[in-house]
Structure formats: C-alpha cells, structure tokens
C-alpha cells in the first residue's frame, strides 16, 4: 500500500462513515464460514479487490457467495474521482509481474465460474494497462478454461489500439462505466469525459458486434430523471446491452456528498425505461457494476429480462 503524501490520497479506511440512511438502505450483513474462507483466500494471495479498496457495501454479501472483484494493475489510481475511495497517486509503481498468477490462484481456490476484473486507471502507461490486463486474462483462461471473464476497464484515454488489444483477449463482457449523467461528469469524474466513454463503448460494439457490452451509472448525485432517461438512451444508441444503476453512497466526508436517496420504486421505473430501449437493466439501491455479475450474465444468456427478483 502506498504511503499517503502530497501526491497520494486515501480517505479513512474501515467502515463507511455514518450517515442517516433511509430504511431501504439498511442491511443485515451476512457472515459465516464462506465469508471467512473468501476473506482468507484474498488475504493469502495478497490481491487487492475493489470490494475492500472502494468500501463496497456489498462486500459481505458477495464474499458469502464466494465472489469477489479483483483490482488489477495495483491499488493506486492516476485519477482522483470525487466518488471513489481508491488511492490516488501521480507516480504509481510498476505492475506486479506476479499479479496474473495471484489472481488466477485466488479464483481457482474460490472455484469462480465468472471472474470479474476491474482496474485502476493507469494513465502513466502507454497503453493504459491494456496489455497487462490481457496477461491476466490469458492466465485465467489457462488456469480456469471453463470460466468466463468480465472486465471493467478505464477509458484508456481514448486509445483505440489499447481497446482493441483488450477486446482481442477473449473476454466475455466488456464493461466501461459512464458513472453519471453528462452534466455531472466534470464534477464526478477526474480526467474523463462522458462523450469519450460513449465513444469507447461504441467502438467496442463496432469491433466485436457479438460481444456483451456493459455500462453503469450511480444515482443520487443531483441528476434529474430526464437526464437518467437520456443517459439510458445514449447507452443504447452506442451499442451497450447491459446497464447497472445503483445508489451513490459517499465513502467519507471528503467525497462528493449524496444529494438524494433514490427510492426502490424509482429504480424500478428506470429499469422499465431501459428495458423499453432494448437494454438489460439491473437496478436497485445496492447495485454496483460487478454485484451479482454472474447472475446477470446467466439471466442475459437465458433471455430472462425480469431481474426484479435478483438480490439488490
């Protein structure tokens, strides 16, 4: 873990700081032997997970199901997004050459059938880390040939060659989040643009028309209903097939404040809007990009459009 300095920033770790939450955002956290096994496996292999680094509210639930989302290319990001709890640094260390094998070892122990990788933005690398991601995916395919792989990638600063490098790896789902509506993007996302994200999603869809393309947004940041509807339309128009929508919860007081707590009924409404546009939408207060990703893939492949019964 990098030591915080004037070039690094890490908000307080541990439990998310207390805010008064509406009743639909209060959880009974699962524990038990499966959670403990997952926790032990992650720690033993020394792998970073977005579950821990981003203080995800679903960590206990996911780990109790023996699922986790691996954080590739280290645990420090070259961008300082206002919603994110991951380390920021201007000078990240070189990628760990043992990381592909560590991730594969962990996934093998947990017997993962659907493996989700996310990444820190590596604007310091010429290809944004795309070739290193491919090394991880290749190792996973060698060690777990029956497992599917989903990658939540950065925008690679608009580098199409880097995108194609990643897409040629044989991944099952390419995921790139727009995170929020266009108007709020300059405040929410550091060094990223809404239009560039749409461009990368569209390029992926054009390059591999049969690939499952996924994106996601957070709500509760001050967006208007009409803006969410426009975002869903934009995603559908740019080749996206799967969309996740979840409630933004700030990790610390140094992050962007929550402007509203969106009701479950509103999430249902957004799901209906997205479905009418031909999107497969997983929406709910606790939904995150990788939450229940294996179930989302299963339902999509079995043409089950009703995700209301999925855990959210």
Curated annotation (Swiss-Prot):
Pathway: Protein modification; protein lipoylation via endogenous pathway; protein N(6)-(lipoyl)lysine from octanoyl-[acyl-carrier-protein]: step 2/2. [4Fe-4S] cluster 1 binds at residues 51, 56, 62, 290. Keywords: 4Fe-4S, Cytoplasm, Iron, Iron-sulfur, Metal-binding, S-adenosyl-L-methionine, Transferase. [4Fe-4S] cluster 2 binds at residues 77, 81, 84. CDD domains: Radical_SAM. It is found in: Cytoplasm. Binds 2 [4Fe-4S] clusters per subunit. One cluster is coordinated with 3 cysteines and an exchangeable S-adenosyl-L-methionine. NCBIfam families: lipA, PRK05481.1, PRK12928.1. This is Lipoyl synthase. It comes from Chlamydia caviae (strain ATCC VR-813 / DSM 19441 / 03DC25 / GPIC).
């Amino acid at each position: 873990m990098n030591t915080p300095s004037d070039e690094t920033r890490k908000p307080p770790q541990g439990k998310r700081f207390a805010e008064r939450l509406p009743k639909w955002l209060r959880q009974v956290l699962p524990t038990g032997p499966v959670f403990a096994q997952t926790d032990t496996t992650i720690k033993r292999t020394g792998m970073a997970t977005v579950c821990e680094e981003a203080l995800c509210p679903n960590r206990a639930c996911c780990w109790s199901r023996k699922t986790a989302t691996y954080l590739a290319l280290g645990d420090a990001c070259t961008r300082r997004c206002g919603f994110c709890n991951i380390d920021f640094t201007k000078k990240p260390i070189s990628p760990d050459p043992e990381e592909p094998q560590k991730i594969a070892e962990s996934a093998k122990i947990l017997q993962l059938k659907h493996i989700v990788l996310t990444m820190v933005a590596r604007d310091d690398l010429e290809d944004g880390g795309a070739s290193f991601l491919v090394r991880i995916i290749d190792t996973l395919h060698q060690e777990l040939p029956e497992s599917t792989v989903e990658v939540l990638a950065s925008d690679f600063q608009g580098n199409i060659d880097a995108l194609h490098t990643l897409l040629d790896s044989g991944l099952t789902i390419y995921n790139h989040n727009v995170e929020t509506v266009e108007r709020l993007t300059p405040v929410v996302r550091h060094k990223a643009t809404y239009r560039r994200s749409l461009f990368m999603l569209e390029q992926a869809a054009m390059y591999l028309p049969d690939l499952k393309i996924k994106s996601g947004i957070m709500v509760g940041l001050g967006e208007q209903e009409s803006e969410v509807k426009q975002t869903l339309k934009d995603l559908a128009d740019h080749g996206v097939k799967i969309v996740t929508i979840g409630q933004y919860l700030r990790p610390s007081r140094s992050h962007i404040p929550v402007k509203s707590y969106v009701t479950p009924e509103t999430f249902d409404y957004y799901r209906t809007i997205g479905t009418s546009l031909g999107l497969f939408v997983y929406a709910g207060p606790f939904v995150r990009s990788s939450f229940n990703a294996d179930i989302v893939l299963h339902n999509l492949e079995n043409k089950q459009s009703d995700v209301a019964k999925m855990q959210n």
